[in-house]
Amino acid sequence: MDAYALPTYFPLAYSELQFLASRRAAAVAAAATVLPGSPCINQHHPTDVSSSVTVPSIIPTGGTSDSIKTSIQPQICNENTLLGNAGHQHNHQPQHVHNINVTGQPHDFHPAYRIPGYMEQLYSLQRTNSASSFHDPYVNCASAFHLAGLGLGSADFLGSRGLSSLGELHNAAVAAAAAGSLASTDFHFSVDGNRRLGSPRPPGGSIRASISRKRALSSSPYSDSFDINSMIRFSPNSLATIMNGSRGSSAASGSYGHISATALNPMSHVHSTRLQQIQAHLLRASAGLLNPMTPQQVAASGFSIGHMPTSASLRVNDVHPNLSDSHIQITTSPTVTKDVSQVPAAAFSLKNLDDAREKKGPFKDVVPEQPSSTSGGVAQVEADSASSQLSDRCYNNVVNNITGIPGDVKVNSRLDEYINCGSISIPSNEYDCANADTTDIKDEPGDFIETNCHWRSCRIEFITQDELVKHINNDHIQTNKKAFVCRWEDCTRGEKPFKAQYMLVVHMRRHTGEKPHKCTFEGCFKAYSRLENLKTHLRSHTGEKPYTCEYPGCSKAFSNASDRAKHQNRTHSNEKPYICKAPGCTKRYTDPSSLRKHVKTVHGAEFYANKKHKGLPLNDANSRLQQNNSRHNLQEHNIDSSPCSEDSHLGKMLGTSSPSIKSESDISSSNHHLVNGVRASDSLLTYSPDDLAENLNLDDGWNCDDDVDVADLPIVLRAMVNIGNGNASASTIGGSVLARQRFRGRLQTKGINSSTIMLCNIPESNRTFGISELNQRITELKMEPGTDAEIKIPKLPNTTIGGYTEDPLQNQTSFRNTVSNKQGTVSGSIQGQFRRDSQNSTASTYYGSMQSRRSSQSSQVSSIPTMRPNPSCNSTASFYDPISPGCSRRSSQMSNGANCNSFTSTSGLPVLNKESNKSLNACINKPNIGVQGVGIYNSSLPPPPSSHLIATNLKRLQRKDSEYHNFTSGRFSVPSYMHSLHIKNNKPVGENEFDKAIASNARRQTDPVPNINLDPLTNISRFSTTPHSFDINVGKTNNIASSINKDNLRKDLFTVSIKADMAMTSDQHPNERINLDEVEELILPDEMLQYLNLVKDDTNHLEKEHQAVPVGSNVSETIASNHYREQSNIYYTNKQILTPPSNVDIQPNTTKFTVQDKFAMTAVGGSFSQRELSTLAVPNEHGHAKCESFHHQSQKYMNTDIGSKQQSALPSAHQRQTEKSNYNQIIDSSMTSLPELNVDSIYPRNETENIFKVHGDHDNEIQCGIISQSQMSPSTNLNNDGQFSTVNMQPITTSKLFPPEPQKIVCDTQASNTSVMHLDTYQRTLEYVQSCQNWMETNNTSTNQIQSLPGMPVNNTLFPDVSSSTHPYHGTNMVINDMTTSLTSLLEENRYLQMMQ
């Protein structure tokens, strides 16, 4: 074996030896001698700042520096004056020193130049090798001196190389060494040679003098003799090593800052070769000149030595830009040797071997050669990750098949491009990287070299690939910056423009074959055209695995997203989302790499290159994207069905799936809604929501074709957009299928890994939703206005309460109402029971089922109607104000009401036992029962009013009413819709049992509400003791049953009719229980406050009058909404009263009664909440104590025929407009929805029907209570005598009616109560309210009938809530519904009033 043959198990040894040899040569050329007679072992110069480093020295034999003929004489010395003492004269020691024992440590060299520890064993093997053909003069020296046994001073070695001395290798180096000046102008490789270092060293200083400089100078004794950057980069752990030469190109040399495009190689740019590059190259290549190399050595060092002259000595002047004078031998194996000079020049003139195959038949089997690096002298193997071409094929293609190619003149100039192919052997397995790169890099072109420009109308031919790249960048790309279009011939992109210039530059590498991004690890020859592909490849060396499996509990990590997707789809899922788009091919794969391989192998490379396999995802069950989606949308959806990407920004490998959640059956089905672990179908109504949606005709505003079904959205999103709550309550079943929100594409984000429900049937949806993007989308949804869709609603005879039917005249506004009817008994949100859930906040909604006391129900409920116009909610859809008080997280019970409640909830009742009382007296499965949908909304209305902000400011206005027991001794808002409750007069006047029972159970605002079990059978026992009846008997008499006490009252106050298939939820309006005493300064003008305070002073007087009012024992009353008119058949008791009483009782009754009247709101004082159902069952003190000018009239009451079940018809709209109706106003001191009790005269269709008509002398409204808004009713008539006119209500009875007992009471009020308020202020307010009422009259709706069933009382008719003070219901007195709008309008009015004063 040759002395320089290294073991094959150490493939990198020889390449490192080359570099070490070059360092040794540089050290020899630059070393200075020490003082005579001194071995200079371990001596330190006073100015030396480095460690004790022993280096060899050159001992000259002559005296002149320009004609030195010297042999290499090794000398052991210190690094005292080698680098910094420029200009010092050194004495040379003339003797040859042998056998000097050096006891220094292996780190005798400076740390920057120490030999790697893992190579010391190899060097020791070389020194002890008996087959050495030369004598190592440093055999007894430290291991740092044995640079792989390459003693350049050996006369035997130099003689065998044809070099008499090292001076012939480079005369200037020896001359400079003798002169002692490293900065000499004769030494072309000094610090001034290329200005790589910051500045020349001082002429007489030491290295310490340069410490204070801004740019650190090297402390090496021989760093100036070769490329300093190459030295710095050399390290086994470095990303760029010296043996790889240039790892960059002129087009992309900046991908790594330490990679120079033209470093070290004299062949890279022969027209501008720099001497320092030549010197460094020669010194580095000297190891290859010393001894012949075996094929293994050639394989290991081929990438650093491109040419190896064997006969003549290589001098500096041999390096010529034109290599035609050189006879360079290509050696790929010991048996294959050809002279390049004998090769026809046409072999190197072809643009690539593909052209050669087209032009010449013998090249059919020629494989494109492995390209060299952009530096031609340093051969490089650019291996594509998807292909492993053998490097010797390049030689065979270029050399063996070259004889038949026509001649060309570019053989010598192209030699530096193709000569490298022959010097590379097959990289065997032992030379492979330790960490094999198994990554299937995406979108990497094959390996070829293009030198001719095929741009349209351009046929320029270039010598090198670099020149072509420069030409394309400068002449084609830079000159046309308006449109970045590839006009390369036969480009499959079809001149589709790029968005940025860099994308076009990257794309052009497909045509030129340029791969500037090369792996910088030792022994790895892979190169890539895209930097991201190189970064992915580098992870195979570094072991970095940033892509972790997203499946819960799986801890596997991967270096690229493709492997992770493969793992997830194969291991945790059965999905195969990557579909081959080839015609007739039905293959599907779990990962994109498998699809790419399939396309390449089955359909061919051309099919793959032309991207014919690409296509939009199939419009099937696994992909609901439309066919007209763009490719960019595919990237947004992370559908990697296309293995190639055109743009660099599309080439990034993203996680293509989130298979942590497998596809389940359609979530929109009601059977899949789990309510606290119980299927909704087990306890709720079992109907298909598609029944309602199948016949809908949606306009353009509801773009459902390209939207995701709301039921398919994750639970978190449904909770946020009011489609349902975080527990997937049954309220989402009916409404969600119609609420096809505009989600698709906007919610296709990533980041949150929902482990329960994803978009089931969409493969690209199996990924996560990002918190930030999700918050942004939710905010957009909140800010969107609603859409009034004109929808045809089919009749639903058997699925709703009372079988509500549709009014054909109100298609536009009955959409949401019908939806609410559709989900009747399953409506209502559980959110009202989760007081502190954070299900509507954007930060804590990831765990929707985890309850938090810190987020109020206002967060989860009150802002729900502000997000989207949800048809399933009895609320107002509007713009969302993120800082509106309606979304206050601290609002407690007043914000508990979820707006998802439909006709089945009776949440207006006071909360007893901390439970929401529900009256779901729904009549299901009964035909011919219908009612007009009551939720008439305007989608642009603002959100609900404030909650906690209203809680403390106006208490002082109510202090004088302490004798009247309110819930919390304050004034609270009144519900905005009512139940038709029938009242019985059998309570004593002074007991106020109703209030006391409720007040005793009032909880503080910070107490959490216990969760309610959704099992209706369990909940029935909580609320109802007498099912199927809901009759409240209230009176002012003293004959109350002794069996009724407070405890029994709490238990028996409300009876709830519930069936097993009904969901029991309680939804409360966010304005509920608003303390009006806390917001007076915010919303009331000063004059209004003065007026109200004066009016309040007469409270005690009025109360006495009201308490003296006798009330008959039999009264009949109906409560209807002022927003709509309806005719209903309801059950009532024999004793019912039209006047608001003070006590409540519950008695079952089977008497039927038919009524029609208008009622907007009762005076309930502090007893009721905003959204809870209000009744006339309120204390008389609360109903009348605050009324200053209430004309209490005794009513003619009557009893209807018990057996009468006939229906009463509604008068036409014209009849109602021409009708004379009298208003009996009972106005509470509530902040929102100040009501009026309007009894409208109804004309009977049938004479046998029980109809009563109310007559009056005046159309008057009585202003009552301490009003919290500045709007005054337009119908208020102030009399000159300071009194309000008396309203006389007289019944009209038929022969079947019992004769009533009339009673009349007139309450007179002094005019001074209202005279304090300026007339202009009142007039402006009046005009404002009138304009609002006029606006609402245009939206007036007709009335449907309410027909009850025998044996099933329906007494809990819901009335719609007044949504805004700017959009009041027609005929109302003072519509103050929405704090958001009220605050805005009244503050502006207050400013105007102050300016007018």
UniProtKB/Swiss-Prot annotation:
UniProt-annotated location(s): Nucleus
Keyword Transmembrane: no
Keyword terms: Activator, Developmental protein, DNA-binding, Metal-binding, Nucleus, Phosphoprotein, Repeat, Repressor, Segmentation polarity protein, Transcription, Transcription regulation, Ubl conjugation, Zinc, Zinc-finger
GO MF annotations, alphabetized: cAMP response element binding protein binding; DNA binding; DNA-binding transcription activator activity, RNA polymerase II-specific; DNA-binding transcription factor activity, RNA polymerase II-specific; identical protein binding; protein homodimerization activity; protein kinase binding; RNA polymerase II cis-regulatory region sequence-specific DNA binding
Annotated GO biological process: compound eye morphogenesis; cuticle pattern formation; dendrite morphogenesis; genital disc anterior/posterior pattern formation; heart formation; labial disc development; mucosal immune response; negative regulation of hippo signaling
Region (Interaction with RDX): 1-440, 1161-1397
GO cellular component: cytosol; Hedgehog signaling complex; nucleoplasm; nucleus; protein-containing complex
Key word Cell membrane present: no
PTM annotation: Polyubiquitinated by RDX in the presence of CUL3, which results in proteasomal degradation.
InterPro entries: GLI-like, Znf-C2H2_ZIC1-5/GLI1-3-like, Znf_C2H2_sf, Znf_C2H2_type
Biased composition (Low complexity): 657-669, 849-863
UniProt-listed Gene3D superfamilies: Classic Zinc Finger
Main location: nucleus
Positions annotated as zinc finger (C2H2-type): 451-476, 484-511, 517-541, 547-572, 578-603
Biased composition regions of type Polar residues, renumbered to the chain: 807-832, 839-848
PANTHER family: TRANSCRIPTIONAL ACTIVATOR CUBITUS INTERRUPTUS
Subunit structure: Interacts with RDX. Interacts with cos. Interacts with slmb; the interaction is enhanced by phosphorylation by CkIalpha and dco.
Protein name in the entry: Transcriptional activator cubitus interruptus
Species name: Drosophila melanogaster (Fruit fly)
